[in-house]
């Protein structure tokens, strides 16, 4: 009988009290909304009164504040979110990582910041695209150079067409400079094998 009374008490207490997840959901919505509206005061207010993981909250489309800021090439917000501990590898809509999102919009400074913050240069989205594949498709030579210098694999194929960054560059007559850069860059394993 005591056990039944305890279960009843516990059930009543749980129904009457909003869960931690519910309160974080509201705060998460407020935070992402502040990022979308570029409302720095609101973002700081919400972050200062909630757990640090809130910075990685996703919106209804599945994008984090970091990906939202990167998508609009917003240096101030991207830097702010990275300084607040945003995960540089947390994928958003379509599985795009922040690094893929930055390559897609040609946001060069974000590429450097993300890599400096531990972003995986060979991370993929749901279609198997890497940041390097996206940069090649965008014909963005400076970003291709940065990614290759940071160890991006030009021979990793995507799932969509089965092509690698090298393959895409070979197939695009307007990407000859990019192809040359890829061809001139020795794979990481080649230097070790030569020793």
Segments from the language model and where they lie:
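Ankyrin-repeat inter-repeat connecting loop/turn
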Residues: 53-55, 88, 121, 154
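Ankyrin repeat boundary/linker residues
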Residues: 59, 92, 125, 158-159
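Start-of-repeat signature of ankyrin repeats
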Residues: 27, 62, 95, 128, ...
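Bacterial N-terminal signal peptides
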Residues: 5-16
């Amino acid at each position: 009988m005591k056990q039944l009374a305890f279960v009843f008490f516990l059930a009543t207490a749980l129904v009457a009290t909003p869960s931690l997840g519910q309160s974080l959901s509201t705060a998460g919505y407020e935070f992402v909304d502040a990022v979308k509206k570029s409302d720095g005061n609101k973002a700081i207010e919400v972050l200062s009164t909630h757990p640090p993981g809130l910075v990685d909250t996703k919106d209804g489309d599945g994008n984090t504040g970091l990906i939202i800021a990167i998508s609009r090439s917003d240096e101030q917000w991207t830097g702010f979110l990275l300084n607040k501990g945003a995960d540089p590898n947390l994928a958003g809509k379509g599985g795009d990582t922040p690094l893929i999102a930055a390559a897609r919009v040609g946001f060069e400074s974000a590429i450097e910041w993300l890599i400096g913050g531990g972003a995986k240069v060979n991370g993929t989205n749901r279609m198997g695209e890497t940041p390097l594949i996206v940069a090649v498709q965008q014909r963005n030579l400076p970003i291709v150079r940065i990614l290759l210098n940071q160890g991006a694999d030009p021979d990793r194929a995507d799932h969509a067409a089965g092509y690698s960054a090298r393959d895409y560059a070979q197939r695009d007559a307007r990407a000859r400079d990019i192809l040359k850069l890829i061809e001139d860059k020795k794979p990481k394993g080649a230097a070790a094998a030569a020793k």
